Each structure stands twice: as C-alpha cells, then as structure tokens.
Amino acid sequence: MKIERLNGGDFLIAPTENSWESAGTSNSGAVMLPSTPELLALISRAAGQDLTKDKRLQEYVVICLYSAVGVMPGNDIRTQRRGLAIFSPRLELCYRHPLPVLSPDFSPDSIDLKGIEDARVTYTDGKFFIWYCGYNGKRGVPCCAWSEDLIHWVKQNPLAGPLGEHENKDHVIFPEPFQGRWWMLHRPWGYEIPDANNYVIRLGSAPTPYGPWQDEGEILRGIAHPDKKISWVGGGAAPLKIADGKYFVLYHNGAFSHDDYRWYEACTCLVDLNNFIPGQPENIVSHRLEPFMAPATEEETNQNKRISIIFPMHAHVYEGKLYFLYGAGDKATCGACVDWQEVKDIMDF
C-alpha cells in the first residue's frame, strides 16, 4: 500500500516563535464539513478575515484545533493550548489563527492546568465538540468542550457519568447516534474494571453527547510482540462511517522495546455497532490491520526523547483518497493520504 506523506513529509503545522506554540504542535484533531455560506461566514468571523473567496474551500472545509505547547506572556506555566487552523480537503493550510482559541483553567485545583491534550474534534447539532484529556500535572481525566463559533467554548471537566470519574485518555465519539445512543472509544487506566492497566480500547455509550457516559467493556487490546517489552493500543481519529452502524477506525499502537525505546504506529480496524451485544462488546471489531503506517522519517523520530511516533488524530475521504492528520515524533502535525479503494481492498470491505 502506497501512502503519500503530504508537503514532502514536512510538518503541516510546525511550532513558531510565538511563545504559546513554540515547544510543540503535535496531536491535532480536526473535522471536515461541507462548505456552506453559513460555515464560510463562521470561519471568516473566527479568523477576522474573509475566507469565503478561497477556492480551496469551496467544497469542504477542514477545521483543525491543533495542539500548541508553550507559555503565554505574563503566565510562566508551560501547558498545552488549542490553536485554530483551516485546511482544504486536500490538507492544504489555508489559515492559522495568531492566538490560542482554547486555554486551560489556571486555578490551583484546575483539571486541565497543564494541558488540553490529544483533542479529537467532532460536529453535531450546530456545535463543534473537542474531546480531550485534561491534565493537571499528576493525573489525566476525560473532558470535552463545545462551541458554536470556534472562539467561545463551554467546558465539561470531567465528562459526566462513570467514565469521567477516573483517569482516562484517547476518547472520541462516533459521528452520530446509533440505535438511540451515542458511542465512544476510550482507554482508561487505574480504573475499577479488569485489566484496565493494560491500556486497552473500550466502548462507552450515553444518551446524549453530554453524557452521562458509561463503560460497555473492552473491544481491542495490543498484540504482544517478541521484540517489544510491552504493547498497547489507544484511540485515534474519529470513526469514519462506511455503512449504517459500520465504521472505519484509525487508532494507534504503542510499544516499548527491551531497551525502553518508545514506538507508536497507526493501525486500522472496522467497528460494526450492529453486532453489539451487552457483555460481549468485542464482537463489534473486525478486519484489523497492524501496522497501517509506521514511523520512517526524520520528522517522525525524536532521538532526544527516544521515541518514534505516528499518532493519528483525524481522517476523511475526499476524491477517492483517505486523508489523515497525525502527530509526528512528538514534535508537530503532519499529514498523509492513500488511495481509499486500495485500503478497502486490503482490508476486504
């Protein structure tokens, strides 16, 4: 399978000299929406400039809430904020906002003091949702926030329901409800459920996107490799709908080698919610492909941290190609594309 790294493999969103985004711009979520006059007007208001005439945005708009690590003038707390970038459906960067659009709460007991981390993006009922791990320097809990204009946000820290009561990460919801409920992929640890410390992907559900979210059980765990000391899995991009209740899922596999070098690669599977049986949620997973894409470039390797990373955060299909954004080397955001039919042929769906 031939995967093309966009922009010659270079970063699509790189750190800048702005102090709030100077230390890293990795793991950036996004959502692609059809271009409408209302949406183009909305992003133009958010940008403070007219984007309605940009020919690259006439069919679809990709709205990215990117990771931005650094400090703000007058605030010496190094943390992770969210910046705003607008891409074309081919992942051409069309606009990048000069200031963060979402920042942590800096009160002493804040859940997200040290970071709004690994934020996936979805859109429903006229609202943009981001699903992120709120990190306070000691523990990370699942959170979300929503906005109608990409500038003003309402936070729910932590998620409502049992899933928000314990440490949890890499959570993202499916794009629409199925059989009267909303569904979520999540990965808890330190949780009062069997084998949670093995970092497995589990299924959650709720009556609304606002919760209350409950756990439905394990659906996917890492595959043991003889050359790795430990392996695990975690969520990636928001699932892509391919049929009623059936989704293409791009997730990540992580591992430590025996000399403690860390490795992340992109993987794929299919999830069919039609097959969900309470108490047997693993029946929904099939057609697993590991790896789908592995680190291979300088951008995807970070020798200072002894880590190589491809961390998928967004995916969409446009003009017969699967496009996706990923965190590269724990440094910045990259993009890639691959023939969608080839993916379907290899995964046999």
Task: Please give the residue ranges for each predicted region.
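Beta-rich, blade/repeat-based domains predominating
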Residues: 119-120, 171-174, 236-238, 311-317
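Beta-rich carbohydrate-recognition and catalytic domains
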Residues: 1-114, 122-168, 176-231, 241-305, ...
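Short glycine-rich, acidic/polar surface loops and turns
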Residues: 299-302, 310-314
